[in-house]
Design a protein with these regions (language model features):
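Catalytic cores and adjacent flexible loops of soluble metabolic enzymes
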Residues: 1-304
Length: 304
């Protein structure tokens, strides 16, 4: 287990894409600025998806261009196809996530194609990214379970991961899209991924649908994950997956990691302030517990 881990806050993208209240560009940028001020360095700032399907992301270009001027952050974006890639690169994006679902039904819902067809459609993007100097991450949705098909064969997931690695991505992320995983699943998958793909970063994207998000994050850290996604306040959900609730709360995750002796570089007080502000903007409570209970120590407790 490393004493350091990369955290990526997905609140400005995954955290708001399902919200009924349409946030203004100014509000999205204020969220990103607050996260940066709290010490978040990797931030997923937008998705270049069709505004028809994800209207919350209609201002992706404006938000990205402004976010890219904030010092000290890595502004990451999500794209689903070559049109999204074109828009992202034209806006100046250099860190792009691609996503494919491990199951046929989920990928049909998300991309209107089977997983193999989506991977084939990504081939021109892989080639262009090398020429454009763009760093790619391959994200595999429903890696641990699917709301339509149930259990997912890990071999199927790792075959998709192998295709991403062969195409030259810098990172592979395994997503528990609807919170179906339990800690032993997480550990087994990530240990295999670490052994099979030593040349790339291994990331995990967790949802807390069944209240196992932090337990799964703990398992991921113990298994050697390099990158953990989370969302300030625990906001989020997938518009194409029924009953998908929020991401694991970044607030609670940072509290856990710091208590484990893992340095995050995040100012927890500022992050909690941001979470409370975010609740006001969204006009409903968020599931993070730390903003409600507060930290129980002023510095990380001794582990001995």
């Amino acid at each position: 287990m490393s004493d350091r881990i990369i955290l990526c806050d997905v609140a400005p993208r995954d955290g708001i894409q399902n919200e009924k209240i349409m946030l203004s560009s100014a509000q999205k940028l204020e969220l990103i600025r607050r996260l940066a001020a709290a010490g978040m360095r990797w931030i997923e700032v937008a998705s270049f998806a069709s505004p028809k399907w994800v209207p919350q992301m209609a201002d992706a270009e404006e938000v990205f261009r402004a976010a890219s001027q904030i010092p000290g952050i890595r502004p990451i974006v999500l794209v689903l196809n070559d049109r999204g890639y074109d828009r992202a690169v034209a806006a100046g994006a250099r860190y792009i996530r691609l996503v494919v679902a491990a199951t046929d039904t989920m990928n049909q819902k998300n991309a209107n194609a089977l997983p193999d067809a989506t991977m084939a459609a990504y081939r021109p993007i892989f080639d262009r990214a090398r020429r454009d100097g763009v760093e790619l991450t391959g994200t595999i949705a429903t890696s641990f379970g699917c709301p339509f098909e149930g259990a997912v064969d890990p071999d199927r997931v790792l075959r998709l991961a192998a295709q991403f690695v062969a195409a030259g991505v810098a990172e592979v992320d395994f997503a528990d899209t609807v919170g179906m995983a339990v800690p032993p699943q997480i550990e087994r998958m990530l240990v295999r991924a670490r052994n099979e793909f030593p040349s790339v970063r291994i990331g995990i994207h967790l949802h807390n649908t069944r209240n196992l998000g932090l337990a799964n994050a703990y398992a991921a850290v113990r298994a050697g994950a390099d990158v953990l996604d989370a969302s300030t306040g625990g906001a989020g959900g997938c518009p194409f997956a029924p009953k998908a609730t929020g991401n694991i709360p970044m607030d609670d995750l940072v509290f856990m990691l710091e208590g484990m002796g893992i340095k995050t570089g995040v100012d927890l007080d500022k992050l909690v302030e941001t979470s409370r502000w975010f609740e006001e903007i969204l006009e409903h409570p968020l599931p993070a517990m730390l903003p409600k209970a507060g930290p129980c120590w002023n510095s990380p407790p001794p582990l001995a």
